[in-house]
Amino acid sequence: MVLAAARVLLLTLAALGASGQGQMPLGGDLGPQMLRELQETNAALQDVRDLLRQQVKEITFLKNTVMECDACGMQPARTPKLTVRPLSQCSPGFCFPGVACTETANGARCGPCPEGFTGNGSHCADVNECTAHPCFPRVRCINTSPGFRCEACPPGFSGPTHEGVGLAFAKANKQVCTDINECETGQHNCVPNSVCVNTVGSFQCGPCQPGFVGDQASGCRRRPQRFCPDGTPSPCHEKADCVLERDGSRSCVCAVGWAGNGLICGRDTDLDGFPDEKLRCSERQCRKDNCVTVPNSGQEDVDQDGIGDACDPDADGDGVLNEKDNCPLVRNPDQRNTDGDKWGDACDNCRSQKNDDQKDTDKDGRGDACDDDIDGDRIRNPVDNCPKVPNSDQKDTDGDGVGDACDNCPQKSNADQRDVDHDFVGDACDSDQDQDGDGHQDSKDNCPTVPNSAQQDSDHDGQGDACDDDDDNDGVPDSRDNCRLVPNPGQEDMDRDGVGDACQGDFDADKVVDKIDVCPENAEVTLTDFRAFQTVVLDPEGDAQIDPNWVVLNQGMEIVQTMNSDPGLAVGYTAFNGVDFEGTFHVNTATDDDYAGFIFGYQDSSSFYVVMWKQMEQTYWQANPFRAVAEPGIQLKAVKSSTGPGEQLRNALWHTGDTASQVRLLWKDPRNVGWKDKTSYRWFLQHRPQVGYIRVRFYEGPELVADSNVILDTTMRGGRLGVFCFSQENIIWANLRYRCNDTIPEDYEAQRLLQA
């Protein structure tokens, strides 16, 4: 470009010289030709200048480019050296499709066959994964190449499509088909308002639901809301149930969460049987609750200030708060305490001798610690062979120094009275042979082959009523006797109602009318009463915590446990066959989050059922003998311990789940919800040991919050009732009620068929 511009300039100058013979005119008069040549020269110079500017830019760009290449290490392009490779040994098709081919010194080599095939890599055959049975039972498996495929889940089941490749996958991954609950999804043909029972892969239709009448053929119609079960008009409050009594009369009972006389019901927040506000009726249960939010079914109020002891910070009104008062229920502002135990002189039954337990066996006002005749049988303790059981005759058949009245082996000498399983039968004579499973060993069972935990023997002939065809021994067989438990050979029946005059209104002749008798067919049991109870410590040798402290109120119908303790039971002495057991459960503190509950079917300290409720998930702090993890929620367990009370049973009770040779988990509330602080719950238990029927329900206020539904288990065929605690303080069990009941519930049969 520069050379070209210079060439143009030289040509122009030459032209100028040629035209003027080398001379420029001296005047200002330029000829036209000269002017034209100057203009052309000027234009040429302008072009040269532009070309020079462009050339400078290009040179600068080339310079910068070269410098940048030097900075990044780039070298001038070189022609690559040509190499000659030998011909590849891995020719197409040498290996099975999808198999890698590798050249080696010894020639080409094929890799393994793909998943779902077997062979040497060059030749691969399909694997039949169906031989591993990856599909759900009754589902067809289809082998593909490669892999397998399962057909859809069978009718009554649902699940995702299932397919895969390879034997390893087929063995490790089975088709999952989940039972369809047709009763929940509506995929059933049961008539509306009837019971639908889900079965594996199908369903069954049952009777009409409560509150409805009819059947599957005619349909289920709502029972008139204000009628009694016998069809007569109901006089009850809208929040009360009409109940038919044994004699055919009707009673009204307020529903859960309500209290009153049944004709009138009001809200009952704490579920203790007393309404929050006074009702317009005169019965005791119509009075206003003196502790609206704390259950106190006895309504105790020692200072008569209208505030119940259970919620009164100064129950005795002496100016000293309960938590510091050494006599919280007896007025003593001076707090005098001569013997220095936990109790002030005003309420201490042994003022000059320490006795924190305040036990008073004969209820004479003098504690056992300072009473020279503990049982009140007029025989002084040092010479009394049963110092805690009245026995003025001092009979001692086996001569072991322990009177028959308190001897756990009266026919066999055993002065130590050892009884490791707490069943009142000493180890010296305890055979543990109980073929009918009712908790009474065969040698002491009045019906050894028929479960009868209550051991009722109305005519005292040594043969239990359960296996005696003439219970009252009046010569009339039970099947024809209009008073089965009361002798009446004449069978008088003035009103011809089928019930003999001798037992009319009081079937067991215990002088408690059937309407209020909790066991109208057992003269030995009349009212709910836990005032006499057996204490069972389930970890007696452990050092984790202290033992429970039980306080009984309301004439034996309320129990309070005050301590953060080891696992323990308070067990009543009455044994039951079939029973209904209900009560109100309340933790009256915001401290701790552990177990509380109740027991039934108690036969000994190794054999019982327990319903227990944990508030929060927690691992037990004693890792020996094994790690135990408690989950929140309600649990129903069958305890059958091979070791009995101790660390093994302790950790097994804490653990949610089965523990071999200790505990089986029969049911757990699927909600996994713990109990709430200072909240009342009402439970209802039905136990029919003759068929293994168990069902437990929990209410929070009027709302049903948990239902085990029907559980069938015959581990314990009857036993005693009680309450349970484990590491939880300030538990209240209020408004306790039990009732003998051998009637089989209607929902038993459907469950039996389901489990058959």
Curated annotation (Swiss-Prot):
Family under the similarity heading: Belongs to the thrombospondin family.
The protein's name: Cartilage oligomeric matrix protein
An example Gene Ontology CC term for this record: collagen-containing extracellular matrix
Region (Mediates cell survival and induction of the IAP family of survival proteins): 526-756
Domain remark from Swiss-Prot or TrEMBL: The cell attachment motif mediates the attachment to chondrocytes. It mediates the induction of both the IAP family of survival proteins and the antiapoptotic response.
Organism annotation: Bos taurus (Bovine)
Positions of region (Disordered): 322-502
Extent of motif Cell attachment site: 366-368
Record text on cofactor binding: Binds 11-14 calcium ions per subunit.
